[in-house]
Each structure stands twice: as structure tokens, then as C-alpha cells.
């Protein structure tokens, strides 16, 4: 009886005997076999039972409730097999024969138990609300997954199956190919039916994409070359469009030519898996093609279409694409493909014969508004999964924030992921198991351990009492869990805009408060914020903020960049700093600043670095330095630093960016600059001002600044083309820094230094006399504010560094006051009024 049993099946029998002995039973019944199957923890039977929600502890409790423990007698030898168990073993052997298996495994043992209609095991399953027919159905499905065989046309099990494929059987014993309505062996083995999944409501609803689905239907209705391929970036919804077609087929919203069609996704990896010998892969794919031809109502869908190029090819073998080509050209089979733009170019376009057999449908990412509509359609699915309530504001925030801050990915995929993670975050943070439940579970576990110890010491009366106590505790636990589940369903936690912003904050590092701040508030406060960071350039800040407000309110042409500015003026007055602060305030961080040093583009051929090298040249696959960064992060500030150094022909590239808000890279892709702020800096005219001596503290009136403006504007018109200047929103001329401005800059730098010293429990007190001294030392009309940094390093940071290195100064918190000693700065402790550090070295002014 046991000669065909697998090792796992034999192990189940051993475990079943142990369970019988534990329960003091002198027999081996079907209930013990069921417990042995679950205790084994592996195999087809266990997978099926777990999928249906049965675990070992639950089944053991139910067995104990139904039959309890036997009398306290010593059982010698193995327990005897009951008649039902013997019959179940016979049924298991019969099931194995029917399934054409030459072994008896755990799955056959479970099928054998299901045949015993009056057995305890079957009663246990019914008490746990498990339908035996559902168990059998799941076992057959599991076997079909694990025991995939070659299709009849490729089976080598017997000569009869090769000579008469229509009479051969599937792994489950079903006759194949004899009737159109029966299951398709090869397609069933290597694919899954999308139309069937629609009937079972297993697919998410498809919102929008009507034009793409319509084009898909038109191509499928052609007589020849009726094979569409969906091309688009990862995450734009290519597979969703095919699922939308499946939904239309089920709803009969397609032409007569496509009605009653079945849309089956082909799993190419599964088809290749397990092919050991030459010709096996070709036989499998030919079997699929033969079945598609025979039934005539099959549409194949191959996701990642580029994988058919080279798939299965070995020495002397033919790859999948060459096997499919003739049938695709003649229209014998219809295939829908989906792949990315890059993979299509690398693999499909190189094979001209394959390319002409497919008709391209380019899938573009949806807009933010379209993404919000898609999220509305998916909202119910995610609410049910996470048991939360998703607000309308959360949907809008997921679409807008993902578009603006999540880069390198595409809508709607990144917005859906954001909403999904926000729902998971809310659920995890607010729906933890109550403390009472956790305490009760711990109490049950302790009672269980005490019961087992009592059994081990043969204190059976105590064990029986603990068993009854454990049973009561479990009933109480079940009741509390049910109340908790009901409470969760009745009181759904909302997922709002703040929850979505927190997820974006985790991914990008931008504070969530800044993400949720209203755009109008941000724009209204922008001017004041920039004036606090960029000192002495109020006119420039006002001009910039005016232009940005025009763009963001929709008054400006939407096809141009958010703003395009040319910053002119002497060096060191804050041109690059203003660009950096705009990136921080408008787009959340310094990483939103794309800085292009135009001194790297002094040669004409250097333009290829910006857009990408032409095909055939070194670096073509890498793309352009500028275009790739903007494509990955469209919401950004692009800073072209010192444009007067670039070759004049390179400046012509920027005309298209400034006027149309786009630039075509070396791959032919149009890179969108409409959400970017374009800033160019230049020192044009600065040398003329230096020669005339009209810079720095020498300015006496407003008219002097007018003279500077005229000189810089004259130099700008002389160096730059009129068509370039006319495309700019603003040409902003920065003022030379005055003494008051330098003092404010010194204060800002000292505040930064003070914040760094907090790690060492030090604080600085810098009086105005020291500030004036530093301003005098750092004033350089030709260099602007940059010398101030060196002055702070020499007069403040160097002596402070010596303080930090001294062991005696690391003991307690202290506040240091700076004082002037002759022509140097000294530090002394404020509370002790004594010198706490060496003075800085004497430096000549």
C-alpha cells in the first residue's frame, strides 16, 4: 500500500501517528492524517489548505473539540488504521492513477480523504466552513501549476501521444484538443486568460485611454499585419490599455470581428523554463501557435515584446521572433505587444522584418487631470484593501506631488504608488492590534505551555482543566477579534493630503509642511523670503517674483518656460545665489537646481554634450547632460552660468527652449522645459564699470546706478543677438553691494557659523564694532561679497578651530564674546570676563 508513497507522504503518516499518540488514541483516523498534512508544513496539500485559511492550530483545536482525548492508558506499538483511512489510501492511489502520476503525494492523500463523506476529517473541514469541492478544485489548480508538461504535440511520453495528439491527456487527465469549449492545454500551461479575469472581477477598472483603445481595435480589425504594439515609457499604462480591451470584449463594446474573442497573456519565461534539450522550446511555441490557429478566437498578448528577440535561441536554434514572423505576416495569429521606447529601439527596430509586422501605438503619460480621474476610478479598490477612506484632496495631492517631486518615473504609475503607500502608512500607524488582544494571546500561549507541561508530567486532571481554560480563552479571543474587525470596518481612517505629503517627504527629504503649503501662499511669501536670503538686490527679486507669479497664475503663455531671466552685473553680488534660493523655495531643495557651466561649451562641437551625441558617436547611449536631467526632473531651475563664455552657435540652441519650452535630444525625444525656470548669468559690462571706477561705495546717487545700467545694457546688446534678448522675460541688472548690505551678509554668515558651533556647546556674541571691522577688511569693489567668506575664515574660524582642539575648552557650555585687539579679533568667555582663547594672528589689511 505504501510502496508508491513519496517521502513527504510517509512523513505525514509518521506525524499523524504522533498526533494520535498525543491524543491518547489507539487508532489512526482521517483526522490524524489531516493534522499530519498540516504539521508537515510543505507540499501541495499544505499550500491548498493554507490558501483556504486553515492552519495547524485551528484544525487541532477543532479535532480536540470533536473527539477529545482518549482514556489515560499506555498505548504500545503503532495505532491501528481505521477502515476509513484504508479506504482513503485506496482512493489516493486511484486519484494518482487518474492523474497519470506514478507516485502518491500529500495532494493525493488529501484527495483520498475528501472521498470519505462521513469521516471526522471532512467534518472538521465543514465546521471550519471549507467546502470539500473547493478543496478539490484548488488541488487541481495547484497541480496544474506545479506539474506543467509539454503540450501534446511536443510530449515524448509515448509514441501514441506523438502520433495522435488529439487523444492525449493533460496533467489533470482532461482530453485535449477534442472540443473547442474544453480547456486549451498549451495556452493554459503558458498563459492566463485576461477575459476570464474580467469576468471574475480580478482586474482593476481602466479609466480613460479611449483613443489608444480605439486605435488598438482598428489595427486588430485589419486583414493583414493586424498586430499592434504599444510603445511607451515604463508606468504609463500600456498593460492597462490591453486590460481595457478585455473589459470591452466582455461588455460587447467591440466590433463583430472581435466579439467572443479571448485575450490570453503569453508567459514567455514560463515557456522557456525547463527546456533542457534542443527543439523543446520550438515545440512549445509551435503548440501554442497551432492551438491559436485551430480555435480562431484567440488574441495573444506578449508583455515586454522585446524578449521574443533571441528567446530560446541557442546554437542552431531559431528564436521566438523568427518562428512567429510568418504567422504574423499572414494574419494566422493575432498578437498584441507592449514594450518601452528604449527596448523597442534596441531590439525591434534592428529587425526590420519583425518591425513591419507590428503597427506602433505610442502611449504618452496622462496629464495631471487625467491621472486624478484614473485615481478616482481606482479609489474604491485601495479603500477596500487598506480599510481606509481616501479623500478627494488626497487624490489631487497624489497626482500633483508625484508629478512635481517624484522624478525618473511616469504618471499614472507613480501617483498610484504614492496613494497606495499613503494608505499603507495610515493603516500601519493607526490600526495596530489592541493591547488587550495581545495580552490575551500571550495568556493563551502560557496556558498552552502549562498544559503541555502537565501532560508531560502525567498530571492529566490539571491538563484537562488547563485545556478547558484554553478553550474559553480562545473563544473570548475570537469574540474580541470579531469586535475589533467590526470596529475597523465602521470607523475607517481617512487618507488625506497630509498623509500623501508625508510619503513624498520620506522619498525626497523635503519637509511635508512645505509640500502641503498652498501655491498661492508660497507665491505671495516668495518675495519676502528671497529678500531675507539675497541681500541688497530688492529690484532683482521683485522682477523675478513678478514673472513667476504671472506664469503660475496661468496668465502667461503655457507653452513657454515658467520664467526666463538674464542676470547681469558685477561678480559676487548674488546672481547664482538667487537662482539657488529660487530652487529651494519653489521646488523644495538645492537638488532642483541644474547648473550648467557655460565655460565647458566654448567649442562649437560641445553642443553635443548638452543634447547628446549623434548616433554612431561615442556617448550616444548616455544622452545629453542637460536634456536627461530635465527629462527626469521637469520641475527645476536651470542655471546657465556665465553665458558669455559659450560659443555663439551654442546660444542658438536656447532659442527653442525660451520660445517653445522644449528641446529635442539626440534620440528624437522632445524634452519639456515648460515647468522649468531658466536663469542665465553674465558678467558682461563689469570690466567697463571697473575701469570707470563707478562701483562700490563710490556710488553717490540713484543716477550713478542708471549709468551702470546703460553700460551693461550696451554690452549685452553688443554681445547677444536680438532674437535671443527678445525671448527673455526679464533682463535683471544687479546693483553693486553697499556697506549696509555687506553688514547683513556678515550677520548671515555668522549665524551659520554659530549654528555649527552648537555641536560643541559654544555660542558667539559678535558686537557691531567687530562686524564693521570685518566689513572693512572684506570690502573689495571688484569681487563683491566673496572676500567676506575669506575674512570670516581668517579672523573668526581659524582661532575658533584652535579652541576646539584644546582639551581644556571641551568641559562645559560657554558663550564667547569677540573683541577687537589692535588689528585682530580675540575671544573671551562672557561669564568669566577673561580671555578664553588666543587672539587671531595679526593680518595686514
UniProtKB/Swiss-Prot annotation:
Disordered: annotated span: 149-179
Region described as Repeat 1: spans on this chain: 5-70
GO biological process assignments: cellular response to heat
Q: Which residues bind ATP?
A: 232-239, 569-576
Q: Where is the Clp R domain?
A: 2-145
Write the signal peptide boundaries.
none
Q: Which Gene3D superfamilies match?
A: 1.10.8.60, Clp, N-terminal domain, P-loop containing nucleotide triphosphate hydrolases, UVR domain
Q: Where is this region: Repeat 2?
A: 81-145
PROSITE patterns from the xrefs? CLP_R, CLPAB_1, UVR
Q: Name one GO molecular function term.
A: ATP hydrolysis activity
- List each copy of the UVR domain by range: 441-476
* Record keywords, A-Z: ATP-binding, Chaperone, Nucleotide-binding, Repeat
Query: Record's GO cellular component, any one?
Result: cytoplasm
Q: Locate the compositionally biased regions of type Low complexity.
A: 151-171
Q: Which residues fall in a coiled-coil region? A: none
Q: Which family is annotated?
A: Belongs to the ClpA/ClpB family. ClpC subfamily.
The protein in question is named Probable ATP-dependent Clp protease ATP-binding subunit
**Annotated organism of origin:** Chlamydia pneumoniae
Q: Which gene encodes it?
A: clpC
Amino acid at each position: 500500500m505504501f510502496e508508491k508513497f513519496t517521502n513527504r507522504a510517509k512523513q505525514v503518516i509518521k506525524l499523524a501517528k504522533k498526533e494520535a499518540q498525543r491524543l491518547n488514541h489507539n487508532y489512526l483516523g482521517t483526522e490524524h492524517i489531516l493534522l499530519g498534512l498540516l504539521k508537515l508544513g510543505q507540499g501541495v496539500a499544505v499550500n491548498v489548505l493554507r490558501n483556504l485559511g486553515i492552519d495547524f492550530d485551528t484544525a487541532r483545536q477543532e479535532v480536540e473539540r470533536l473527539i477529545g482525548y482518549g482514556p489515560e492508558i499506555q498505548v504500545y506499538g503503532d495505532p491501528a488504521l481505521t477502515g476509513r483511512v484504508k479506504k482513503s489510501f485506496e482512493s489516493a492511489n486511484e486519484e494518482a492513477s487518474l492523474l497519470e502520476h506514478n507516485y502518491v503525494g500529500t495532494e493525493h492523500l488529501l484527495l483520498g480523504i475528501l472521498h470519505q463523506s462521513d469521516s471526522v476529517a471532512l467534518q472538521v473541514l465543514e465546521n471550519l466552513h471549507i467546502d470539500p469541492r473547493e478543496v478539490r478544485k484548488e488541488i487541481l489548480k495547484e497541480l496544474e501549476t506545479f506539474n506543467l508538461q509539454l503540450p501534446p504535440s511536443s510530449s515524448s511520453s509515448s509514441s501514441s501521444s506523438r502520433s495522435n495528439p488529439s487523444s492525449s491527456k493533460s496533467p489533470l487527465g482532461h482530453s485535449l484538443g477534442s472540443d473547442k469549449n474544453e480547456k486549451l492545454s498549451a495556452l493554459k500551461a503558458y498563459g492566463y486568460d485576461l477575459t476570464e479575469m474580467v469576468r471574475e472581477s480580478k482586474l482593476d477598472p481602466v479609466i480613460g485611454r479611449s483613443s489608444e483603445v480605439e486605435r488598438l481595435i482598428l489595427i486588430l480589425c485589419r486583414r493583414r499585419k493586424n498586430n499592434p504594439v504599444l510603445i511607451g515609457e515604463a508606468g504609463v499604462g500600456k498593460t492597462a490599455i490591453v486590460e481595457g480591451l478585455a473589459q470591452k470584449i466582455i461588455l460587447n463594446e467591440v466590433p463583430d470581428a472581435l466579439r467572443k474573442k479571448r485575450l490570453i497573456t503569453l508567459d514567455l519565461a514560463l515557456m522557456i523554463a525547463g527546456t533542457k534539450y534542443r527543439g523543446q522550446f520550438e515545440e512549445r511555441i509551435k503548440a501554442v501557435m497551432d492551438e491559436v490557429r485551430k480555435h480562431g478566437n484567440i488574441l495573444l498578448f506578449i508583455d515586454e515584446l522585446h524578449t521574443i528577440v533571441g528567446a530560446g535561441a541557442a546554437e542552431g536554434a531559431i528564436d521566438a521572433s523568427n518562428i512567429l514572423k510568418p504567422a504574423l505576416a499572414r494574419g494566422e495569429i493575432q498578437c498584441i505587444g507592449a514594450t518601452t521606447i528604449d527596448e523597442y529601439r534596441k531590439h525591434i527596430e534592428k529587425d526590420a522584418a519583425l518591425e513591419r509586422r507590428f503597427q506602433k501605438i505610442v502611449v504618452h503619460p496622462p496629464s495631471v487631470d487625467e491621472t486624478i480621474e484614473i485615481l478616482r476610478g481606482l479609489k474604491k479598490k485601495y479603500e477596500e484593501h487598506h480599510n481606509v477612506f481616501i479623500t478627494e484632496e488626497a487624490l489631487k495631492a497624489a497626482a500633483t506631488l508625484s508629478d512635481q517631486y517624484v522624478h525618473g518615473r511616469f504618471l499614472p504609475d507613480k501617483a498610484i504608488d504614492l496613494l497606495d503607500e499613503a494608505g499603507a502608512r495610515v493603516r500601519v500607524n493607526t490600526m495596530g492590534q489592541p493591547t488587550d488582544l495581545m495580552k490575551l494571546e500571550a495568556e493563551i500561549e502560557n496556558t498552552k505551555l502549562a498544559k503541555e507541561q502537565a501532560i508531560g508530567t502525567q498530571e492529566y486532571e490539571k491538563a484537562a482543566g488547563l485545556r478547558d481554560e484554553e478553550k474559553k480563552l480562545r473563544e473570548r479571543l475570537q469574540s474580541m477579534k470579531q469586535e475589533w474587525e467590526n470596529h475597523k470596518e465602521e470607523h475607517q481612517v481617512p487618507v488625506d493630503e497630509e498623509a500623501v505629503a508625508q510619503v513624498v517627504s520620506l522619498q525626497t527629504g523635503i519637509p511635508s509642511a512645505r509640500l502641503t503649503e498652498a501655491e498661492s501662499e508660497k507665491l505671495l511669501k516668495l518675495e519676502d523670503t528671497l529678500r531675507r536670503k539675497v541681500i541688497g538686490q530688492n529690484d532683482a527679486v521683485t522682477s523675478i517674483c513678478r514673472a513667476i507669479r504671472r506664469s503660475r497664475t496661468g496668465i502667461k503663455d503655457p507653452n513657454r518656460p515658467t520664467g526666463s531671466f538674464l542676470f547681469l552685473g558685477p561678480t559676487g553680488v548674488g546672481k547664482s545665489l538667487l537662482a539657488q534660493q529660487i530652487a529651494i523655495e519653489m521646488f523644495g531643495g538645492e537638488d532642483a537646481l541644474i547648473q550648467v557651466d557655460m565655460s565647458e561649451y566654448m567649442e562649437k562641437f560641445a553642443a553635443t554634450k548638452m543634447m547628446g551625441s549623434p548616433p554612431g558617436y561615442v556617448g550616444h547611449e548616455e544622452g545629453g547632460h542637460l536634456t536627461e536631467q530635465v527629462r527626469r526632473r521637469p520641475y527645476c531651475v536651470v542655471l546657465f552660468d556665465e553665458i558669455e563664455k559659450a560659443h555663439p552657435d551654442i546660444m542658438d540652441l536656447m532659442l527653442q527652449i525660451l520660445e517653445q519650452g522644449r528641446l529635442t535630444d539626440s534620440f528624437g525625444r522632445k524634452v519639456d522645459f515648460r515647468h522649468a525656470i531658466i536663469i542665465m548669468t553674465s558678467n558682461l559690462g563689469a570690466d567697463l564699470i571697473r575701469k570707470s571706477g563707478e562701483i562700490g561705495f563710490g556710488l553717490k546717487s540713484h543716477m550713478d546706478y542708471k549709468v551702470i545700467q546703460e553700460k551693461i545694457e550696451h554690452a549685452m546688446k553688443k554681445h547677444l543677438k536680438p532674437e535671443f534678448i527678445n525671448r527673455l522675460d526679464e533682463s535683471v541688472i544687479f546693483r553693486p553691494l553697499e556697506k549696509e548690505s555687506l553688514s547683513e551678509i556678515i550677520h548671515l554668515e555668522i549665524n551659520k557659523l554659530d549654528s555649527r558651533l552648537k555641536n560643541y556647546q559654544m555660542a558667539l556674541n559678535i558686537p557691531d564694532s567687530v562686524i564693521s571691522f570685518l566689513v572693512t577688511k572684506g570690502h573689495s569693489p571688484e569681487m563683491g561679497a566673496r572676500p567676506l567668506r575669506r575674512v570670516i575664515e581668517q579672523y573668526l574660524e581659524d582661532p575658533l578651530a584652535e579652541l576646539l582642539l584644546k582639551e581644556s575648552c571641551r568641559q562645559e557650555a560657554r558663550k564667547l564674546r569677540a573683541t577687537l585687539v589692535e588689528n585682530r579679533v580675540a575671544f573671551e568667555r562672557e561669564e568669566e570676563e577673561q580671555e578664553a582663547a588666543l587672539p587671531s594672528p595679526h593680518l595686514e589689511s
